């Protein structure tokens, strides 16, 4: 299923569910996705109470620990290529930046200016193993999942644009569809976009029958076993 097979409204419908629920729904619809395709490492979430975000990945790599070796003109050309890549392709987007330094996050590529620029270019959020800063001036509504918070930008600059990157254990290519919230991010197969809301509601229904017993008076192992037995008989 290509992007023409679903609408922006279909994508936005997925933001009604947190990322763990989307992961569960993916397992229901496509069991082969279980165990991979999501972030697996610790991160800092900028806005834990913000609703989930979804968008098409724009990828790049940065460095910040040492000065670059490109001429000023060549570095400016690479910067321009980077911004063009953010502005090219389907939107909304999520920006996925891999910091290649041995100590990722030595300098922050991201702050007040970059967050504002990327909102202007149609991005809804950021995943980076690098660092961010300027938290009080950060663009409203732009989520981030980052490796750390930093004070300085040091020598932060893009060193490559596009292709495959790895952030928090997740391999991402430009154009991948990502769902993210304070728990992390998961790649969403486009063919499953329209089916995911119903699958998510089915998962919630299954869990509610167990939670009703667990949270009710007189919960016992036998009551729980019977509830699980009922689910097994249905599903």
Task: Give the ranges of each region predicted by the language model.
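Extracellular/luminal Protease-associated
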Residues: 84-128
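A short secondary-structure junction signal
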Residues: 72, 107-110, 129-130, 137-140, ...
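General beta-strand structural signal in soluble alpha/beta enzymes
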Residues: 36-38, 96-98, 126-130, 144-146, ...
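Intrinsically disordered, low-complexity regions enriched in acidic/Ser/Thr/Pro/Gln residues
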Residues: 1-76, 80-89, 206-219, 225-226
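Buried hydrophobic positions in well-ordered alpha/beta secondary-structure cores of metabolic enzymes
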Residues: 26, 118, 176-178
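Acidic, glycine-rich flexible loop/linker segments
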Residues: 147-223
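Ligand/cofactor pocket segment of small-molecule handling proteins
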Residues: 115-136, 141-150
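Short coil/turn connectors at secondary-structure junctions
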Residues: 54-55, 90-93, 121-124, 139-142, ...
């Amino acid at each position: 299923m290509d992007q023409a097979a679903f609408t922006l409204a279909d994508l936005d419908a997925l933001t009604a569910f947190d990322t763990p629920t989307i992961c569960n729904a993916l397992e229901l619809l496509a069991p082969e996705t279980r165990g991979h395709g999501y972030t697996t490492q610790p991160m800092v979430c900028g806005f834990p109470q913000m609703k989930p975000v979804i968008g098409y990945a724009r990828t790049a790599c940065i460095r910040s620990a040492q000065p670059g070796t490109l001429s000023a003109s060549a570095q400016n050309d690479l910067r321009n290529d980077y911004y063009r890549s953010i502005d090219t392709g389907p939107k909304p987007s999520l920006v996925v930046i891999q910091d290649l330094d041995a100590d990722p996050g030595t300098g922050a590529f991201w702050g007040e200016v970059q967050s504002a620029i990327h909102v202007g270019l149609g991005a809804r959020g950021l995943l980076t193993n690098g660092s961010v800063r300027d938290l009080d001036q950060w663009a409203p509504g732009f989520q981030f999942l980052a490796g750390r918070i930093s004070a300085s930008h040091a020598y932060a600059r893009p060193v490559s644009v596009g292709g495959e990157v790895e952030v928090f254990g997740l391999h991402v290519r430009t154009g991948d569809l990502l769902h993210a919230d304070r728990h992390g991010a998961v790649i969403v197969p486009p063919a499953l976009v329209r089916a995911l809301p119903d699958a998510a509601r089915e998962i919630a229904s299954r869990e509610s029958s167990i939670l009703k017993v667990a949270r009710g008076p007189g919960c016992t192992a036998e009551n729980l076993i019977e509830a699980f037995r009922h689910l097994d008989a249905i599903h």
